[in-house]
Swiss-Prot record:
It comes from the Eukaryota. It comes from Gibberella moniliformis (strain M3125 / FGSC 7600) (Maize ear and stalk rot fungus). InterPro entries: Lag1/Lac1-like, TLC-dom. This is Ceramide Synthase FUM18. Disruption phenotype: Does not affect the production of fumonisins B1, B2 and B3. Increases the production of ceramide intermediates including 3-ketosphinganine, sphinganine and phytosphingosine, in comparison to the control. Causes significant growth inhibition in both solid and liquid media. Double knockout of FUM17 and FUM18 does not reduce resistance to FB1.
Protein backbone atom coordinates (compact mmCIF):
# COMPACT_ATOMS: atom_id res chain seq x y z
CA UNK A 1 0.00 0.00 0.00
CA UNK A 2 2.84 2.40 0.80
CA UNK A 3 4.27 1.71 -2.67
CA UNK A 4 1.02 2.96 -4.20
CA UNK A 5 1.24 6.23 -2.28
CA UNK A 6 4.89 6.63 -3.27
CA UNK A 7 3.97 6.30 -6.92
CA UNK A 8 1.10 8.76 -6.55
CA UNK A 9 3.26 11.32 -4.78
CA UNK A 10 6.02 10.99 -7.39
CA UNK A 11 3.55 11.90 -10.15
CA UNK A 12 1.93 14.88 -8.46
CA UNK A 13 4.73 17.46 -8.97
CA UNK A 14 4.96 16.94 -12.72
CA UNK A 15 1.46 18.36 -13.21
CA UNK A 16 0.64 20.19 -9.99
CA UNK A 17 3.83 21.63 -8.65
CA UNK A 18 2.15 23.56 -5.85
CA UNK A 19 1.10 20.22 -4.32
CA UNK A 20 4.67 18.96 -4.07
CA UNK A 21 4.98 17.27 -0.72
CA UNK A 22 8.42 18.82 -0.34
CA UNK A 23 6.61 22.13 0.17
CA UNK A 24 4.53 20.48 2.88
CA UNK A 25 6.84 18.61 5.23
CA UNK A 26 3.93 17.22 7.22
CA UNK A 27 2.24 15.60 4.21
CA UNK A 28 3.80 12.23 5.08
CA UNK A 29 2.68 12.33 8.70
CA UNK A 30 -0.74 13.89 8.16
CA UNK A 31 -1.92 12.05 5.07
CA UNK A 32 0.20 9.14 3.93
CA UNK A 33 0.85 7.35 7.20
CA UNK A 34 -2.76 7.45 8.44
CA UNK A 35 -4.01 6.17 5.09
CA UNK A 36 -1.45 3.38 4.96
CA UNK A 37 -2.68 2.30 8.39
CA UNK A 38 -6.38 2.51 7.57
CA UNK A 39 -6.57 1.34 3.97
CA UNK A 40 -5.25 -2.19 4.62
CA UNK A 41 -8.53 -2.77 6.45
CA UNK A 42 -10.42 -2.01 3.25
CA UNK A 43 -9.72 -5.47 1.90
CA UNK A 44 -11.94 -8.45 1.46
CA UNK A 45 -15.19 -8.17 3.39
CA UNK A 46 -14.66 -4.58 4.51
CA UNK A 47 -13.91 -3.42 0.98
CA UNK A 48 -17.22 -4.84 -0.22
CA UNK A 49 -19.08 -3.03 2.56
CA UNK A 50 -17.29 0.20 1.67
CA UNK A 51 -18.21 -0.18 -1.99
CA UNK A 52 -21.88 -0.67 -1.12
CA UNK A 53 -21.88 2.42 1.08
CA UNK A 54 -20.07 4.48 -1.56
CA UNK A 55 -22.55 3.47 -4.26
CA UNK A 56 -25.47 4.34 -1.98
CA UNK A 57 -24.09 7.83 -1.33
CA UNK A 58 -22.89 8.69 -4.83
CA UNK A 59 -25.53 7.10 -7.09
CA UNK A 60 -29.11 8.10 -6.15
CA UNK A 61 -30.58 5.72 -8.73
CA UNK A 62 -29.06 2.80 -6.81
CA UNK A 63 -30.65 3.70 -3.47
CA UNK A 64 -33.63 1.32 -3.84
CA UNK A 65 -31.13 -1.54 -4.09
CA UNK A 66 -28.34 -0.41 -1.75
CA UNK A 67 -30.74 0.67 1.00
CA UNK A 68 -31.56 -3.01 1.57
CA UNK A 69 -27.97 -3.51 2.69
CA UNK A 70 -27.82 -0.44 4.94
CA UNK A 71 -31.27 -0.29 6.54
CA UNK A 72 -33.95 -2.64 7.80
CA UNK A 73 -36.36 -3.65 5.05
CA UNK A 74 -40.06 -4.44 4.84
CA UNK A 75 -41.46 -1.75 7.12
CA UNK A 76 -45.23 -1.60 7.25
CA UNK A 77 -46.29 2.08 7.02
CA UNK A 78 -49.63 1.50 8.74
CA UNK A 79 -48.10 0.06 11.92
CA UNK A 80 -44.41 0.97 11.84
CA UNK A 81 -43.55 -2.70 12.39
CA UNK A 82 -41.33 -4.87 10.21
CA UNK A 83 -42.01 -8.15 8.45
CA UNK A 84 -39.72 -10.89 7.19
CA UNK A 85 -38.50 -10.58 3.60
CA UNK A 86 -35.72 -11.16 1.12
CA UNK A 87 -34.21 -7.76 1.94
CA UNK A 88 -33.12 -9.22 5.28
CA UNK A 89 -30.51 -11.30 3.47
CA UNK A 90 -28.88 -8.12 2.15
CA UNK A 91 -28.92 -6.49 5.58
CA UNK A 92 -27.34 -9.53 7.26
CA UNK A 93 -24.67 -9.71 4.56
CA UNK A 94 -23.73 -6.06 5.11
CA UNK A 95 -23.72 -6.61 8.88
CA UNK A 96 -21.32 -9.53 8.46
CA UNK A 97 -18.98 -7.37 6.39
CA UNK A 98 -19.23 -4.49 8.86
CA UNK A 99 -18.61 -6.66 11.91
CA UNK A 100 -15.62 -8.26 10.23
CA UNK A 101 -14.13 -4.83 9.59
CA UNK A 102 -14.91 -3.57 13.09
CA UNK A 103 -13.37 -6.66 14.61
CA UNK A 104 -10.17 -6.28 12.63
CA UNK A 105 -9.95 -2.55 13.25
CA UNK A 106 -10.62 -2.73 16.98
CA UNK A 107 -8.20 -5.59 17.50
CA UNK A 108 -5.38 -4.09 15.48
CA UNK A 109 -5.60 -0.39 16.24
CA UNK A 110 -7.29 -0.21 19.64
CA UNK A 111 -6.99 -3.37 21.71
CA UNK A 112 -3.52 -4.55 20.69
CA UNK A 113 -1.88 -1.16 21.38
CA UNK A 114 -3.73 -0.98 24.71
CA UNK A 115 -2.43 -4.42 25.68
CA UNK A 116 1.14 -3.40 24.90
CA UNK A 117 0.80 -0.17 26.87
CA UNK A 118 -0.47 -2.21 29.83
CA UNK A 119 2.63 -4.40 29.73
CA UNK A 120 1.54 -7.45 27.72
CA UNK A 121 4.77 -8.35 25.95
CA UNK A 122 4.26 -11.67 24.18
CA UNK A 123 2.65 -11.23 20.78
CA UNK A 124 0.50 -14.32 21.18
CA UNK A 125 -1.00 -12.93 24.37
CA UNK A 126 -1.56 -9.58 22.67
CA UNK A 127 -3.56 -11.36 19.97
CA UNK A 128 -5.56 -13.35 22.52
CA UNK A 129 -6.24 -10.21 24.56
CA UNK A 130 -7.43 -8.45 21.42
CA UNK A 131 -9.76 -11.32 20.51
CA UNK A 132 -11.31 -11.41 23.97
CA UNK A 133 -11.47 -7.62 24.09
CA UNK A 134 -13.50 -7.54 20.87
CA UNK A 135 -15.96 -10.09 22.27
CA UNK A 136 -16.25 -8.00 25.43
CA UNK A 137 -16.89 -4.85 23.38
CA UNK A 138 -19.57 -6.52 21.25
CA UNK A 139 -21.51 -8.07 24.12
CA UNK A 140 -21.21 -4.94 26.24
CA UNK A 141 -23.55 -3.42 23.64
CA UNK A 142 -25.78 -6.30 22.59
CA UNK A 143 -26.38 -8.04 25.91
CA UNK A 144 -27.81 -4.87 27.51
CA UNK A 145 -29.82 -4.34 24.32
CA UNK A 146 -31.23 -7.85 24.59
CA UNK A 147 -32.02 -7.30 28.27
CA UNK A 148 -33.86 -4.09 27.38
CA UNK A 149 -35.96 -5.94 24.81
CA UNK A 150 -36.72 -8.72 27.31
CA UNK A 151 -37.55 -6.32 30.16
CA UNK A 152 -40.03 -4.42 27.97
CA UNK A 153 -41.71 -7.59 26.66
CA UNK A 154 -44.84 -9.20 28.15
CA UNK A 155 -43.06 -12.55 28.51
CA UNK A 156 -40.61 -11.04 31.03
CA UNK A 157 -42.90 -12.22 33.83
CA UNK A 158 -45.16 -14.66 31.98
CA UNK A 159 -43.58 -17.32 29.79
CA UNK A 160 -46.95 -18.16 28.24
CA UNK A 161 -46.59 -14.88 26.35
CA UNK A 162 -43.74 -16.45 24.38
CA UNK A 163 -46.31 -18.46 22.44
CA UNK A 164 -49.58 -16.54 22.58
CA UNK A 165 -50.78 -14.92 19.33
CA UNK A 166 -48.48 -16.96 17.11
CA UNK A 167 -47.59 -16.21 14.38
CA UNK A 168 -46.50 -12.62 14.86
CA UNK A 169 -45.84 -11.72 11.24
CA UNK A 170 -44.65 -8.20 12.08
CA UNK A 171 -42.18 -7.28 14.82
CA UNK A 172 -40.69 -4.13 16.29
CA UNK A 173 -37.72 -2.65 14.43
CA UNK A 174 -35.44 -2.90 17.47
CA UNK A 175 -36.15 -6.62 17.83
CA UNK A 176 -35.53 -7.18 14.13
CA UNK A 177 -32.25 -5.28 14.28
CA UNK A 178 -31.19 -7.28 17.35
CA UNK A 179 -32.01 -10.68 15.85
CA UNK A 180 -30.45 -9.99 12.44
CA UNK A 181 -27.30 -8.46 13.92
CA UNK A 182 -26.86 -11.43 16.24
CA UNK A 183 -27.26 -13.71 13.23
CA UNK A 184 -24.63 -11.71 11.36
CA UNK A 185 -22.29 -11.88 14.35
CA UNK A 186 -22.41 -15.66 14.51
CA UNK A 187 -21.93 -15.98 10.76
CA UNK A 188 -18.92 -13.70 11.12
CA UNK A 189 -17.67 -15.95 13.93
CA UNK A 190 -17.80 -18.96 11.60
CA UNK A 191 -15.73 -17.02 9.07
CA UNK A 192 -13.26 -15.89 11.73
CA UNK A 193 -12.70 -19.35 13.15
CA UNK A 194 -11.79 -20.58 9.66
CA UNK A 195 -9.53 -17.63 8.81
CA UNK A 196 -7.52 -17.79 12.02
CA UNK A 197 -5.07 -20.53 12.90
CA UNK A 198 -7.05 -23.56 14.01
CA UNK A 199 -7.09 -24.24 17.71
CA UNK A 200 -7.71 -27.50 19.49
CA UNK A 201 -11.36 -26.59 20.01
CA UNK A 202 -12.00 -25.87 16.33
CA UNK A 203 -14.66 -28.53 15.82
CA UNK A 204 -16.41 -27.72 19.09
CA UNK A 205 -16.65 -24.09 18.04
CA UNK A 206 -17.94 -24.98 14.59
CA UNK A 207 -20.67 -27.23 16.00
CA UNK A 208 -21.71 -24.61 18.55
CA UNK A 209 -21.78 -21.81 15.98
CA UNK A 210 -23.85 -23.76 13.46
CA UNK A 211 -26.39 -24.82 16.09
CA UNK A 212 -26.72 -21.19 17.19
CA UNK A 213 -27.15 -19.95 13.62
CA UNK A 214 -29.74 -22.65 12.92
CA UNK A 215 -31.77 -21.76 16.00
CA UNK A 216 -31.73 -18.04 15.18
CA UNK A 217 -32.86 -18.72 11.62
CA UNK A 218 -35.64 -21.09 12.68
CA UNK A 219 -36.96 -18.65 15.27
CA UNK A 220 -36.88 -15.75 12.81
CA UNK A 221 -38.30 -17.44 9.71
CA UNK A 222 -41.06 -19.27 11.62
CA UNK A 223 -41.98 -16.16 13.66
CA UNK A 224 -40.74 -17.26 17.08
CA UNK A 225 -38.56 -14.19 17.63
CA UNK A 226 -39.74 -13.80 21.22
CA UNK A 227 -38.23 -17.08 22.37
CA UNK A 228 -35.24 -16.56 20.05
CA UNK A 229 -34.32 -13.24 21.61
CA UNK A 230 -34.84 -14.65 25.11
CA UNK A 231 -32.45 -17.54 24.49
CA UNK A 232 -29.83 -15.16 23.11
CA UNK A 233 -30.07 -12.99 26.24
CA UNK A 234 -29.62 -15.98 28.54
CA UNK A 235 -26.72 -17.40 26.56
CA UNK A 236 -24.99 -14.03 26.23
CA UNK A 237 -24.95 -13.19 29.94
CA UNK A 238 -21.64 -14.97 30.54
CA UNK A 239 -20.17 -13.70 27.26
CA UNK A 240 -19.36 -10.44 29.03
CA UNK A 241 -17.89 -11.97 32.19
CA UNK A 242 -15.79 -14.65 30.52
CA UNK A 243 -13.77 -12.40 28.15
CA UNK A 244 -13.56 -9.77 30.90
CA UNK A 245 -11.94 -12.32 33.22
CA UNK A 246 -9.51 -13.35 30.51
CA UNK A 247 -8.58 -9.75 29.76
CA UNK A 248 -7.93 -9.19 33.46
CA UNK A 249 -5.75 -12.26 33.47
CA UNK A 250 -3.60 -10.96 30.64
CA UNK A 251 -3.26 -7.57 32.32
CA UNK A 252 -2.18 -9.14 35.61
CA UNK A 253 -5.16 -8.18 37.79
CA UNK A 254 -5.27 -11.57 39.49
CA UNK A 255 -7.48 -10.76 42.48
CA UNK A 256 -10.08 -9.03 40.35
CA UNK A 257 -9.94 -11.95 37.94
CA UNK A 258 -10.85 -14.34 40.78
CA UNK A 259 -13.80 -12.14 41.74
CA UNK A 260 -15.05 -12.00 38.16
CA UNK A 261 -14.68 -15.78 37.92
CA UNK A 262 -16.93 -16.18 40.97
CA UNK A 263 -19.53 -13.90 39.36
CA UNK A 264 -19.13 -15.86 36.13
CA UNK A 265 -19.75 -19.12 38.04
CA UNK A 266 -22.99 -17.87 39.59
CA UNK A 267 -24.21 -16.28 36.35
CA UNK A 268 -23.51 -19.48 34.43
CA UNK A 269 -25.74 -21.49 36.80
CA UNK A 270 -28.60 -19.00 36.77
CA UNK A 271 -28.62 -18.21 33.05
CA UNK A 272 -27.61 -21.51 31.46
CA UNK A 273 -28.99 -24.11 33.86
CA UNK A 274 -31.99 -22.41 35.47
CA UNK A 275 -33.52 -19.88 33.10
CA UNK A 276 -32.42 -21.83 30.03
CA UNK A 277 -33.99 -25.09 31.27
CA UNK A 278 -37.14 -23.19 32.24
CA UNK A 279 -37.37 -22.10 28.62
CA UNK A 280 -36.79 -25.66 27.41
CA UNK A 281 -39.57 -26.82 29.72
CA UNK A 282 -41.85 -24.15 28.29
CA UNK A 283 -41.14 -25.47 24.79
CA UNK A 284 -41.96 -28.98 26.01
CA UNK A 285 -45.07 -28.29 28.09
CA UNK A 286 -46.49 -24.85 27.22
CA UNK A 287 -46.30 -24.98 23.43
CA UNK A 288 -48.67 -27.99 23.01
CA UNK A 289 -51.10 -26.31 25.40
CA UNK A 290 -51.09 -22.90 23.71
CA UNK A 291 -50.33 -23.48 20.01
CA UNK A 292 -52.42 -25.98 18.13
CA UNK A 293 -50.84 -27.67 15.08
CA UNK A 294 -51.97 -25.33 12.33
CA UNK A 295 -50.93 -23.14 9.41
CA UNK A 296 -51.48 -19.48 8.51
CA UNK A 297 -51.14 -17.58 5.25
CA UNK A 298 -50.85 -13.94 4.24
CA UNK A 299 -49.46 -10.77 5.75
CA UNK A 300 -50.22 -9.52 9.25
CA UNK A 301 -53.04 -7.34 7.88
CA UNK A 302 -54.52 -10.17 5.83
CA UNK A 303 -53.84 -13.32 7.81
CA UNK A 304 -55.81 -16.46 6.93
CA UNK A 305 -56.07 -19.42 9.26
CA UNK A 306 -55.84 -21.62 11.13
CA UNK A 307 -55.46 -24.13 8.32
CA UNK A 308 -54.63 -27.83 8.59
CA UNK A 309 -50.98 -28.86 8.46
CA UNK A 310 -50.19 -30.58 5.13
CA UNK A 311 -48.63 -34.02 5.03
CA UNK A 312 -45.89 -32.99 2.59
CA UNK A 313 -42.56 -31.27 3.24
CA UNK A 314 -43.31 -28.15 1.20
CA UNK A 315 -44.89 -26.34 4.15
CA UNK A 316 -41.50 -26.46 5.90
CA UNK A 317 -39.71 -24.92 2.92
CA UNK A 318 -42.31 -22.35 1.90
CA UNK A 319 -41.54 -19.76 4.65
CA UNK A 320 -37.93 -19.58 3.44
CA UNK A 321 -39.02 -18.76 -0.12
CA UNK A 322 -42.31 -16.88 0.32
CA UNK A 323 -42.28 -14.89 3.58
CA UNK A 324 -46.01 -14.15 3.25
CA UNK A 325 -46.84 -17.70 2.27
CA UNK A 326 -47.94 -20.56 4.45
CA UNK A 327 -46.21 -20.92 7.82
CA UNK A 328 -47.04 -23.94 9.95
CA UNK A 329 -46.51 -25.12 13.48
CA UNK A 330 -46.44 -28.84 14.12
CA UNK A 331 -45.30 -31.14 16.87
CA UNK A 332 -42.32 -32.23 14.77
CA UNK A 333 -41.18 -28.61 14.53
CA UNK A 334 -41.47 -28.23 18.30
CA UNK A 335 -39.44 -31.39 18.85
CA UNK A 336 -36.77 -30.17 16.44
CA UNK A 337 -36.39 -26.86 18.29
CA UNK A 338 -36.27 -28.67 21.62
CA UNK A 339 -33.64 -31.09 20.33
CA UNK A 340 -31.35 -28.24 19.29
CA UNK A 341 -31.82 -26.54 22.66
CA UNK A 342 -31.08 -29.72 24.60
CA UNK A 343 -28.01 -30.42 22.50
CA UNK A 344 -26.63 -27.06 23.56
CA UNK A 345 -27.55 -27.91 27.15
CA UNK A 346 -25.53 -31.13 26.96
CA UNK A 347 -22.48 -29.16 25.89
CA UNK A 348 -23.05 -26.67 28.69
CA UNK A 349 -23.41 -29.44 31.28
CA UNK A 350 -20.06 -30.87 30.24
CA UNK A 351 -18.47 -27.43 30.51
CA UNK A 352 -20.11 -26.87 33.88
CA UNK A 353 -18.64 -30.07 35.29
CA UNK A 354 -15.15 -28.79 34.64
CA UNK A 355 -16.07 -25.30 35.86
CA UNK A 356 -16.99 -26.88 39.20
CA UNK A 357 -13.54 -28.45 39.39
CA UNK A 358 -12.03 -25.05 38.69
CA UNK A 359 -14.11 -23.47 41.44
CA UNK A 360 -12.98 -26.13 43.91
CA UNK A 361 -9.40 -25.42 42.93
CA UNK A 362 -9.88 -21.71 43.56
CA UNK A 363 -11.30 -22.42 47.02
CA UNK A 364 -8.22 -24.54 47.70
CA UNK A 365 -6.01 -21.60 46.81
CA UNK A 366 -4.92 -22.79 43.39
CA UNK A 367 -4.96 -20.67 40.25
CA UNK A 368 -8.35 -20.23 38.66
CA UNK A 369 -8.85 -22.13 35.43
CA UNK A 370 -11.80 -21.57 33.16
CA UNK A 371 -13.02 -24.16 30.74
CA UNK A 372 -14.58 -22.35 27.86
CA UNK A 373 -13.81 -23.19 24.27
CA UNK A 374 -11.16 -20.52 23.72
CA UNK A 375 -8.17 -22.69 24.58
CA UNK A 376 -5.07 -21.38 26.21
CA UNK A 377 -2.56 -23.60 27.95
CA UNK A 378 0.72 -22.81 29.58
CA UNK A 379 2.37 -24.48 26.65
CA UNK A 380 0.63 -22.14 24.23
CA UNK A 381 1.47 -19.11 26.31
CA UNK A 382 5.13 -20.00 26.49
CA UNK A 383 7.57 -18.83 23.87
CA UNK A 384 8.34 -21.24 21.02
CA UNK A 385 11.49 -23.28 21.50
CA UNK A 386 13.52 -23.73 18.36
CA UNK A 387 14.27 -27.34 17.54
CA UNK A 388 15.13 -27.17 13.88
CA UNK A 389 11.73 -28.28 12.62
CA UNK A 390 9.62 -25.19 13.18
CA UNK A 391 7.57 -26.83 15.91
CA UNK A 392 7.49 -25.79 19.53
CA UNK A 393 9.31 -28.19 21.80
CA UNK A 394 6.15 -28.64 23.88
CA UNK A 395 4.34 -29.95 20.81
CA UNK A 396 6.84 -32.78 20.45
CA UNK A 397 6.66 -34.16 23.96
CA UNK A 398 6.00 -37.90 24.22
CA UNK A 399 2.36 -38.77 24.28
CA UNK A 400 1.25 -35.57 22.54
CA UNK A 401 -0.45 -35.73 19.18
CA UNK A 402 0.42 -33.02 16.71
CA UNK A 403 -2.51 -33.69 14.45
CA UNK A 404 -5.69 -35.66 13.95
CA UNK A 405 -8.82 -35.46 11.90
CA UNK A 406 -12.52 -36.16 11.83
CA UNK A 407 -14.41 -37.25 14.92
CA UNK A 408 -11.26 -38.38 16.70
CA UNK A 409 -9.85 -34.87 16.50
CA UNK A 410 -13.07 -33.38 17.77
CA UNK A 411 -13.34 -35.75 20.75
CA UNK A 412 -9.66 -35.39 21.61
CA UNK A 413 -9.93 -31.64 21.25
CA UNK A 414 -12.95 -31.41 23.53
CA UNK A 415 -11.17 -33.36 26.25
CA UNK A 416 -8.20 -31.02 26.07
CA UNK A 417 -10.25 -27.87 25.64
CA UNK A 418 -12.32 -28.46 28.72
CA UNK A 419 -9.11 -28.61 30.72
CA UNK A 420 -7.73 -25.43 29.21
CA UNK A 421 -6.22 -22.66 31.29
CA UNK A 422 -7.57 -19.26 32.04
CA UNK A 423 -5.05 -18.78 34.86
CA UNK A 424 -5.74 -15.68 36.84
CA UNK A 425 -2.12 -15.95 37.96
CA UNK A 426 0.64 -15.74 35.37
CA UNK A 427 3.53 -18.07 35.87
Amino acid sequence: MSIVFSVVRSRIPSHYGHYNHSHHPHFEDLVVKPLTNILPLLTGFTLLAGVILLIHISIPQAEPYTSKFLFLSHRQPSTGLYSVGDGDVCFVLFEVLTLAGLREGCMKYLLAPFARVMGVSKERKVVRFSEQGWILMYYSVFWPLGMLIWAKSPHFSDMDQLWIHWPQRDIDGLIKFYILTQLAYWIQQVISVNIEARRKDYWLNVVHHFITITLILLCYVYHHTRVGSLILVMMDAIEILFPFAKCLRYLGFTTLCDLVFFLFFVTWIVSRHVLYLMTCWSVYSDVPRIIEPSCFMGSANDLHGPLPVPDDWWHLIEPWIYPKGKVCHSDSFRVSILAYLLLLQVLMMIWFGFICKVAIGVLDGRAAEDVRSDVESDEEDSEPVANGSGWQQSQLQPGRRVGSNGAAQMVDGVKKDLRCNIHCNEE
